[in-house]
Amino acid sequence: MNKSFGCLVAAILVISIVACGPAEPKLDLAAYEAEIMEWRGGRLERLLAPNGYLTQIGLHWLDERVYTIGSDPGSDIVVPATAAARIGELRVAPDGVWLVVEEGVEVLQDGEPVSEVLMAADTSENPVMVTHRSLAWSIIERDGPIAVRIRDYEHPFVDTFGPLPYYDIDPAYRVTAELKKYDEPRTVAVDTVIEGFQQFPIAPGIVTFELNGQRYELEPTISGEKLFFVFGDETNRDETYGAGRFVYADSPGEDGRLVLDFNKSYSPPCAFNDFSTCPVASPRNRIPLRIEAGERFAPNLHYSGTATP
């Protein structure tokens, strides 16, 4: 081989390696499948936990007034018949929501009986949850409006729940993506399943990735050390939850690269009950593509019950 030609070939190889960057490590398919199956097991375990989404049986939005709570049908907030006819009153005041317990009725906070307690909301440093027999309730605050969320730790829906339906595991939906940061992280308005209510998380930038030879982009928000994606795709019409799905990704390295794994995408809590306030996919986060990976939707795994304004 001509010496000059050999040097030219070597130079081209070096330039190609530098231009392409480090090669992606080959995916161990068996280990990857085991990872996804472990993730699915953890997902179901969290759903079935006492304070998971499946024990939620009621959501009641509150104005500044007094509400009676109990199993008596005449109560402002009616709970299952396993509870006392009149548990007490929720008094919504400028300083918060006070629970005043009916005399002779046992309500516990951290295992200790209480007769009156200020119900600090879930947005506070020390939120309060109280229990009565199999029931528990707490106050949630969503950018101003407040509600009482009720759980039943003996809810029969939990016993009959499952299994969660999934698409087959497909490594093609585990993609390398890139975060293109905004000049400054920005607050974005995100609609929720509650009409008129929005959330206002922080978005660091736009994530771009490629699927089936086409480039797409999503706007994630910051969730602790991770990026949180609320996305929609063409499967929302028939096989996945209509309002979209969730997926998390580890924050990118200094090069802005991250792994976005749609095999770990899952249905939001509102796919399982009517008592959640989850965000829905924004128009910019709806992808014109069928992402046939991750969790699917099954109508029989949704509990409606009652939710009152």
Please state what every model-predicted region is.
Residues 16-19:
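C-terminal motif of bacterial Sec signal peptides marking the signal peptidase cleavage site
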Residues 1-9:
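Bacterial N-terminal signal peptides that target proteins for export
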Residues 21-23:
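Bacterial signal peptide processing site
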Residues 131-199:
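Surface-exposed beta-loop interaction hotspot
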Residues 111-126, 215-264:
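An exposed acidic His-Trp-rich patch
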Residues 176-236, 241:
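Flexible, glycine-rich surface segments
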Residues 163-166, 234-238, 251, 257-259, ...:
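Extended, aromatic/histidine-rich regions of cofactor-dependent oxidoreductases associated
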Residues 56, 61-127:
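Forkhead-associated
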